[in-house]
Amino acid sequence: MVPLPDYRPKQMSLGPLETEILHIIWELGSVTVKDVHDRILADPNRELAYTSVTTVLRRLTEKGWLACDKEGRAFYWRPLVTQEQAQAIDAHEKLHRFLAVSNPDVVAAFADSLDYASCQQLEAIAQRIQAARRQREKK
């Protein structure tokens, strides 16, 4: 289980091209614009301007997803959170939005719609919550 990181991007919402490029960076690690551009153009059915990749990398940096380092004359972008951390942050935010509804009828309707596998997952989550509570009580 990946713990919730202390650092979070400033803006979680990403467009389709931003998401695609972020996944490329998670796969490759530290990248240049050329690395990303070449990866996208490896698909013969794709067209994308080099400057568009630069713009998206800059936007991902402004949103807090990437850091940019200059080495010599080249700029390298690297992720500030791992893919697993991003998934944990996303799940945490979705759970908080769900709980913010604060309407027992909505929560009950959700619980009624769960299948057996989902119920087992919720039971496992409940057990982890209980274990975390016991740990806090010991402190």
Language model regions located:
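Short helix-coil junctions and helix-kink-helix linkers
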Residues: 39-48
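Short acidic, hydrophobic short linear motifs in intrinsically disordered regions
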Residues: 31-40
